[in-house]
C-alpha cells in the first residue's frame, strides 16, 4: 500500500533505517537518504512516499528540494521485494508531486551499479546529467602542517553575502537555502580565513556517529596553497573529537583535483551515483 507522507513519524523513521540496513547489506555502498532532512520534514506537504506491506516497509522514495530549479529523488526497495513494480509505482507517484511544485526538472539518483535503476530512469525518458563519487573517512585523517595564518570560524546569517560570493566563485552558483543553513542549529557553516580575509567555506553536519562535509569551496585565487587540505584535516579531526566515526562527502567524478585532495586526506570511494535528469514538462 502506498502512503503519501506529510512528515515522517518515529515509526516510519525506524522502518526507513531498517530498510536502509537491508539494502546496504545486500548491495553494498551507501544510500543518499540525507537523514537530517528526513528527520526535519515540516509536514506541510507530501515529500516522502512509502510502500508498506502491513507493518513492513518495502519501498521508499523521497523528494529533496535544492533551490528553485531542481528536486532530487532518492529511493530504495527491499531486496526481497524487487521485481514487483514497487520502484515504478513510487516514481510514477512522485512525478505529479514534482510538477505540482512547479519544478522544471528532477534528478533521480541511481547507484552506479544498479542496472534496474538505470533502466527505470531511461524508461521515463531521463538522460544522464552527471555522476558523483561518495567517499568516506573511517580513520584519522592524514597528518600534515597547519598554517597559523589560516583560521576557521562559524558563519552567521550576516555572513550570507560572503559565503554566497565564495560558493559562486568556486561552483558558479550559491547554495539554495543558505540563510536557513547559516541559522540552523543542526549544521555548521564555517568561514575559512587567511590572515583575516575570507577565502573559503565548508558546511558540516552530524547525526550520531556519522558526519557529512558539504559545500567545501576555496576561492580560486587562493587555491594551490594547501589551504583546502589543511582545512579538511582540521574539520575531520574536530568531527572525530566530537564522536563522529564515519565522515562522508561527495565529489563529481570529473573533478580529479578535488578527488585527489580528498583521498590524500584519507577518504576512500564507497560508491558512485548517477544523476538522471527528468524534464517534468515532457512527462505529461
Which residues does each predicted region cover?
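Conserved acetyl-CoA-binding loop of GNAT-fold acetyltransferases
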Residues: 122-130, 263-272
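Conserved GNAT acetyl-CoA-binding A-motif
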Residues: 96-112, 120, 239-250
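Phosphate-binding active sites in nucleotide-utilizing proteins
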Residues: 176, 183-194, 198-207
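Conserved donor-binding loop and adjoining core beta-sheet/short helix segment
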Residues: 8, 21-24, 28-101, 110, ...
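Glycine-rich acetyl-CoA-binding "A-motif" of GNAT/NAT acetyltransferases
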Residues: 56-59, 116, 196-200, 257
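Short amphipathic alpha-helix that is part of the acyltransferase structural core
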Residues: 1-37, 145-174
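Conserved beta-strand-loop-alpha-helix junction that forms the acyl-donor binding cleft
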Residues: 107-117, 220, 249-259, 275-283
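Conserved acetyl-CoA-binding loop-helix of GNAT-fold acetyltransferases
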Residues: 83-96, 123, 215-218, 224-241, ...
Amino acid at each position: 500500500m502506498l502512503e503519501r507522507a506529510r512528515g515522517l513519524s518515529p515509526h516510519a523513521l525506524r522502518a526507513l533505517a531498517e530498510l536502509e540496513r537491508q539494502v546496504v547489506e545486500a548491495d553494498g555502498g551507501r544510500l543518499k537518504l540525507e537523514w537530517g532532512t528526513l528527520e526535519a520534514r515540516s509536514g506541510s506537504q507530501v515529500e516522502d512516499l512509502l510502500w508498506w506491506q502491513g507493518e513492513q516497509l518495502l519501498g521508499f522514495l523521497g523528494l529533496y528540494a535544492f533551490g528553485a530549479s531542481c528536486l532530487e529523488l532518492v529511493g530504495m526497495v527491499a531486496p526481497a521485494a524487487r521485481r514487483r513494480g514497487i520502484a515504478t509505482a513510487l516514481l510514477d507517484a512522485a512525478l505529479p508531486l514534482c510538477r505540482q511544485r512547479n519544478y522544471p526538472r528532477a534528478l533521480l539518483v541511481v547507484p552506479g551499479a544498479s542496472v534496474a535503476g538505470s533502466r527505470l530512469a531511461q524508461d521515463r525518458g531521463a538522460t544522464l546529467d552527471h555522476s558523483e563519487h561518495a567517499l568516506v573517512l573511517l580513520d584519522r585523517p592524514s597528518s600534515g602542517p597547519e598554517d597559523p595564518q589560516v583560521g576557521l570560524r562559524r558563519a552567521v546569517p550576516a555572513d550570507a553575502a560572503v559565503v554566497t560570493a565564495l560558493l559562486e566563485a568556486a561552483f558558479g552558483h550559491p547554495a539554495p537555502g543558505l540563510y536557513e543553513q547559516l541559522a540552523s542549529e543542526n549544521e555548521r557553516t564555517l568561514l575559512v580565513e587567511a590572515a583575516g580575509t575570507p577565502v573559503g567555506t565548508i558546511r558540516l553536519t552530524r547525526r550520531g556517529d556519522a558526519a557529512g562535509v558539504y559545500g567545501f569551496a576555496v576561492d580560486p585565487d587562493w587555491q594551490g596553497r594547501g589551504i583546502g587540505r589543511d582545512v579538511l584535516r582540521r574539520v575531520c579531526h574536530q568531527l572525530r573529537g566530537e564522536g563522529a566515526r564515519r565522515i562522508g562527502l561527495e565529489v563529481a567524478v570529473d573533478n580529479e583535483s578535488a578527488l585527489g585532495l580528498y583521498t590524500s586526506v584519507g577518504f576512500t570511494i564507497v560508491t558512485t551515483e548517477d544523476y538522471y535528469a527528468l524534464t517534468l514538462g515532457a512527462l505529461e
